[in-house]
């Protein structure tokens, strides 16, 4: 009986050790753990179309969550909610404003060498490469090294040597099946052991800069090992990938967000939602809507709220426009009263009658409503504009907008510029006819991180400036 208990304790201890080692295997590369976007973690949006076991997607989701101020790290740390820690603020991107990921395509052979081919045609001329890193998986090599018996030409000394990884980069030309050596690199993988890091990385910034300067965007990498008697060829699984940090000089140009997010010609048309399905089914209704809404939308062209023109009119205008008639006391007329008694209920006046006090309250309530320049709420849903098919996260964001009047005299809260102040005075004096009042425009704006697929189905993270209105002013 005692022997059985001893064997049971020994088995349980071995099981705990193996579980602890397996947990350590996932610790050295924290950026490659599964990352859940903030909108999915909160249940505010649909699940991401990314594959759950795809290391490239996990890495990009992690970066997005970090630079968009998500709460993934906070949610994983126990006790944060109890301590009442504030929500994470978006961090500035480490380098530039763009992170592009490139996954290896179908492997090819070049002079009996296996190449992992990358298509880098998504890089634009305006994107200046700041840094580039190649990530590759070597777990299979470690397993072979640790399981190699001494009898199969794997000496004890060879097993303890450092693993040396050789990387050779090739430029693949589409014409004539030509190839050109781009460069050689080596990586010291360290000594193989049970909790060895499964992923290694190597800086390839200079290689990609050289290829981009020569406008060569089809690159192949051959990954081999040396320094011991193990097989030279290594086939990493999962496939390697590249992360490129770049600074897009054209991201602040007009309509840059439209040109980069809407230019997805290769996406299947059936997957993109059709925005004009309702207008095709009911064209007459659409025409009636356009005619009816034309007058309503006109004030918005001048940064005015609908109905704002009533604020600055005199009381006579209200008297002309009001639909109600005030009650006026008149001397009693017996003949009229007799006639009114003869009328049936169908001949009663259809105009509602209110006293003067009720009308004054309604008039005062309308004047109290905020009509000055201010920030108004606006939520943009990418599904409404047909972009949800390739935008991974966020599915929607709070954009806000500025609207309202900048009439003289403007209070300090509207933060008018000197030019806006002078313009409002000139308009109020009326010396120069036709001078409009200053406009209500955004004063401060913040950026927005967007994670999306490019035309080659690679995951891209871009930080677009001036996407959310923080405050408004008169200019």
Swiss-Prot record:
It is found in: Secreted. SUPFAM superfamilies: Cystine-knot cytokines. One of its GO terms (biological process) is negative regulation of ossification. Pfam families: TGF_beta (PF00019), TGFb_propeptide (PF00688). Residues 346-356 have a biased composition (Polar residues). Disulfide bonds join 373-440, 402-472, 406-474. It comes from the Eukaryota. One of its GO terms (molecular function) is growth factor activity. Glycans are attached at residues 119, 143, 177, 222, 466. The keyword Signal applies. Keywords: Chondrogenesis, Cleavage on pair of basic residues, Cytokine, Developmental protein, Differentiation, Disulfide bond, Glycoprotein, Growth factor, Osteogenesis, Secreted, Signal. Its main location: secreted. Residues 68-97, 261-300, 321-358 are annotated as: Disordered. The keyword Secreted applies. Residues 23-365 form a propeptide. One of its GO terms (cellular component) is extracellular space. Residues 1-22 form the signal peptide. Residues 336-345 have a biased composition (Basic residues). Induces cartilage and bone formation. Homodimer; disulfide-linked. Belongs to the TGF-beta family. This is Bone morphogenetic protein 3. It comes from Bos taurus.
């Amino acid at each position: 009986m005692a022997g059985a208990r001893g064997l049971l304790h020994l088995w349980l201890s071995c099981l705990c050790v193996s579980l602890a080692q397996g947990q350590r295997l996932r610790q050295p590369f924290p950026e490659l753990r599964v990352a859940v976007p903030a909108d999915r973690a909160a249940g505010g949006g649909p699940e991401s179309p990314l594959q759950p076991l795809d290391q490239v997607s996990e890495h990009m989701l992690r970066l997005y969550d970090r630079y968009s101020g998500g709460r993934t790290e906070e949610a994983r740390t126990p006790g944060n909610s109890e301590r009442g820690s504030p929500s994470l603020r978006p961090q500035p991107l480490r380098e530039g404003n763009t992170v592009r990921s490139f996954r290896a395509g179908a492997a090819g052979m070049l002079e009996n060498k296996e190449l992992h081919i990358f298509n880098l045609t998504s890089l634009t001329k305006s994107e200046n490469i700041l840094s580039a890193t190649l990530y590759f998986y070597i777990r299979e090599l470690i397993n072979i090294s640790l399981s190699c018996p001494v009898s199969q030409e794997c000496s004890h000394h060879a097993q303890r040597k450092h693993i040396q990884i050789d990387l050779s980069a090739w430029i693949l030309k589409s014409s004539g099946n030509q190839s050109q050596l781009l460069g050689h690199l080596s990586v010291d993988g360290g000594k193989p052991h049970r909790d060895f890091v499964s992923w290694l990385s190597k800086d390839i910034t200079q290689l990609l800069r050289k290829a981009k300067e020569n406008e060569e965007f089809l690159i192949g990498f051959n990954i081999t090992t040396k320094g011991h008697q193990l097989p030279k060829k290594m086939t990493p699984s999962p496939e390697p990938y590249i992360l490129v940090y770049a600074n897009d000089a054209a991201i602040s140009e007009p309509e840059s967000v439209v040109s980069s997010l809407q230019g997805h010609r290769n996406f299947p048309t059936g997957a993109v939602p059709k925005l004009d399905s309702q207008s095709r089914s009911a064209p007459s209704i659409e025409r009636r809507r356009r005619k009816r809404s034309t007058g309503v939308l006109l004030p918005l062209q001048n940064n005015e709220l609908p109905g704002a023109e009533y604020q600055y009119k005199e009381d006579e205008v209200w008297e002309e426009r009001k639909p109600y008639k005030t009650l006026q006391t008149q001397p009693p007329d017996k003949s009229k009263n007799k006639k009114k008694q003869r009328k049936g209920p169908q001949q009663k006046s259809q105009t509602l009658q209110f006293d003067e006090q009720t009308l004054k309250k309604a008039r005062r309530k309308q004047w109290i409503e905020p009509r000055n320049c201010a920030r108004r709420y606006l939520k943009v849903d990418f599904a409404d504009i047909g972009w949800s098919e390739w935008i991974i996260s966020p599915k929607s964001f709070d954009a806000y907008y500025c609207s309202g009047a900048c009439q003289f005299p403007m209070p300090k809260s509207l933060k008018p510029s000197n030019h806006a102040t002078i313009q409002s005075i000139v308009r109020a004096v009326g010396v120069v006819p036709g001078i409009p009042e200053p406009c209500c425009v955004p004063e401060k704006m913040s950026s927005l991180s967007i994670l999306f697929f490019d035309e080659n189905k690679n995951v891209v993270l871009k930080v677009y400036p001036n996407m959310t209105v923080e405050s408004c002013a008169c200019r």
